[in-house]
Amino acid sequence: MISGLFIFNLKGDTLICKTFRHDLKKSVTEIFRVAILTNTDYRHPIVSIGSSTYIYTKHEDLYVVAITKGNPNVMIVLEFLESLIQDLTHYFGKLNENTVKDNVSFIFELLDEMIDYGIIQTTEPDALARSVSITAVKKKGNALSLKRSHSSQLAHTTSSEIPGSVPWRRAGIKYRKNSIYIDIVERMNLLISSTGNVLRSDVSGVVKMRAMLSGMPECQFGLNDKLDFKLKQSESKSKSNNSRNPSSVNGGFVILEDCQFHQCVRLPEFENEHRITFIPPDGEVELMSYRSHENINIPFRIVPIVEQLSKQKIIYRISIRADYPHKLSSSLNFRIPVPTNVVKANPRVNRGKAGYEPSENIINWKIPRFLGETELIFYAEVELSNTTNQQIWAKPPISLDFNILMFTSSGLHVQYLRVSEPSNSKYKSIKWVRYSTRAGTCEIRI
């Protein structure tokens, strides 16, 4: 149970003080300021002082703090604090000290709906929006304003809609054109050796949805037939991320880990049929998140050659080949490190632009459009000054940033997307599915 919730600014001033139970002393805010904010030893999100546990997170110029007694499930409380921050950001557009000060009444009423006697009730924005009588208006210039909902309309909405089985979607939504967008966005972390071998690779992905659909529609989309969620330990040890033909491992299975879903997703259908079925929330939402370490499609084959011909000259030769289909393209940005005592750098490339940036000791190579199944070559001669006290160059890795549209490194893809409305047999909608893979931390050793 949460005994109290507080929002402080960076100085420790109390902006919001909301108690849900009668087991807190008045000194709890002062204890947080003195014992935690001013004490560098307390830099953990969970701190126990006496019989109280302080669970807090920092956002912009705010500290959002929950205080509990006894032995609570702190992970649930931390998740609630993150949901509270997301909800307030959703309502205000931006959450900071000024927006909190201008929306105190709204925040108090919102907390009354979210927590009842210390027990978390809901964090769903649509359900909360229908149950509070004060509506926060997003920023217009530098000012925020509040509008009060009509009380009779609110009472009708609260009694008729909130107790339903779909708290994340209100009834009576109407659009002139029904449309739904599914985006699968992946970030790849990659480490490549100086010989071009993949030392480590992993993918974190999210399935995002933007729904502008009338009524109470049923949506479903199917994922890969060859979809798996875990490997046996003996199998996992025998596999390697270094494979240059990921589809040959495990018969081309897409292997996902740590899958998490929005509450609207019906999990039994996903587990049994690899089908995501749901009644969508209105607007944008993250339907699913996942990670993958196996059977990853590495989009590029990169071989770096860095040779020091003498104390005054280094030769760079980097070849990169796109291993995705020819109809796709990507944008790339290489940050190639050079020693600090560079006198002159002459990069030559067959695509894009490359230039020496002395302030960062790098050569920046930007390729706006790199077609699949093609190869690019980077070549540079770097002249160094002859200094006797120069330290040995540590050879930091090359960093790579990229973005590939209509490509997923995990291999995850949508086979079909269907939208129907039980009360309307002629229901029509526009459906889009998009994919993208972006660089996380991608490094190439030299």
UniProtKB/Swiss-Prot annotation:
Annotated SUPFAM superfamilies: Second domain of Mu2 adaptin subunit (ap50) of ap2 adaptor, SNARE-like
Single Gene Ontology BP annotation: clathrin-dependent endocytosis
UniProt keyword annotations, A-Z: Cell membrane, Coated pit, Endocytosis, Membrane, Phosphoprotein, Protein transport, Transport
Cellular compartment(s): Cell membrane; Membrane, Coated pit
Domain MHD positions: 177-445
Gene Ontology CC entries for this record: AP-2 adaptor complex; cell cortex of cell tip; cell division site; cytoplasmic vesicle; cytosol; mitotic spindle; mitotic spindle pole body; nucleus
Highest taxon above the source species: Eukaryota
Function: Component of the adaptor complexes which link clathrin to receptors in coated vesicles. Clathrin-associated protein complexes are believed to interact with the cytoplasmic tails of membrane proteins, leading to their selection and concentration. AP50 is a subunit of the plasma membrane adaptor (Potential).
Family to which this protein belongs: Belongs to the adaptor complexes medium subunit family.
UniProt-recorded name of the protein: AP-2 complex subunit mu
Organism per entry: Schizosaccharomyces pombe (strain 972 / ATCC 24843)
